Each structure stands twice: as structure tokens, then as C-alpha cells.
Regions:
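Amphipathic protein-protein interaction modules
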Residues: 63-114
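Detector for Asparagine
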Residues: 2-3, 22-25, 90, 102, ...
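Negatively charged, low-complexity tracts enriched in Asp/Glu with abundant Ser/Thr
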Residues: 2-61
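Aromatic-enriched hydrophobic runs in primary sequence
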Residues: 18, 73-75, 104, 130-133
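Generic structural signal for short, flexible, solvent-exposed coil/loop and linker residues
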Residues: 17-18, 31, 51-53, 70-72, ...
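Alpha-helical structural motif
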Residues: 24-28, 42, 96, 118, ...
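Mixed-charge, Lys/Arg-enriched low-complexity segments
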Residues: 105-136
């Protein structure tokens, strides 16, 4: 188990570095996507992004802005996605759909490098998500 933890930690850092190398620096988005890619069923996660119904737990998750009306207390803008990690109210990042697709491109590329057998499915989901938000 100790070896597995070291490998996951190494992969996590490689993924964080890749995000930063590509100018993507929102720490909570990075943390959540890295956890999704390394600790969860990533294909189900991508399906959740496509359906706008991504995993939510007490300490990790994704919320779409269309779940709130402008008059709601939790409203955080139109066409945005909130990533949270941790229990503090301030432990979150909010990004646009365009930014979401940029972050997903990096994590999908990384995931495919480690799971080549799932490349076709991953790329299909990524393409469907980009088309949904009209991102090239």
C-alpha cells in the first residue's frame, strides 16, 4: 500500500506540474480534477461533466451555476462551474465553461497516457463536452 501511495503522489505532482506548465493555476480545480483522475472512475466523472452532474461529497465536488437563480444566496454567475475541496467556505475556484474545457483537456491527456486502452472513450467524452459548450 505504501508503494501505491508513492506512485499516486508522484502522478498527482506530475499532473499539477502539467496544469501549471499550461498556465492553468486554479488550485482547487487542479486538486479536484487530479483526485478525480487518480482516485475515482474517471470515465464516470467525464460522463458527469457531460451531464452536469459531477460527483459531490462533503469535501470534494463540482457545482454548476445554473443550479442557482440570480436571487439565490449561493449564486455565483452565469455559465460557470465551481470546484470545491475541503470544508471551508472559501476553499473553491470558479471557472467559465471555456476554462473548464482547458482544464479537462489537460487531465484527459494525462489520463490517456496512463490508460491508453480508454483513449477512445475519453476523447469522445471530451469532444462531446467541448461541443456542448461550443469550445474548440
Amino acid at each position: 500500500m505504501n508503494n501505491l501511495w508513492k506512485i499516486l503522489k508522484k502522478y498527482y505532482q506530475l499532473l499539477v506540474d502539467r496544469f501549471k506548465k499550461n498556465g492553468l493555476n486554479k488550485s482547487f480545480v487542479i486538486t479536484v480534477l487530479a483526485k478525480f483522475a487518480l482516485d475515482f472512475d474517471f470515465i464516470k466523472v467525464l460522463d458527469g461533466f457531460f451531464k452536469e452532474d459531477v460527483i459531490r461529497r462533503d469535501t470534494i465536488g463540482v457545482v454548476y451555476s445554473d443550479e442557482f437563480a440570480e436571487s439565490d444566496e449561493g449564486y455565483f454567475g452565469e455559465d460557470k462551474v465551481l470546484f470545491y475541496y475541503g470544508v471551508d467556505d472559501n476553499w473553491h475556484d470558479i471557472i467559465t465553461f471555456d476554462e473548464l474545457c482547458n482544464y479537462l483537456q489537460i487531465v484527459c491527456d494525462f489520463y490517456v497516457e496512463k490508460h491508453n486502452e480508454e483513449a477512445e472513450v475519453v476523447q469522445r467524452y471530451l469532444q462531446k463536452i467541448k461541443e456542448k459548450y461550443k469550445v474548440k
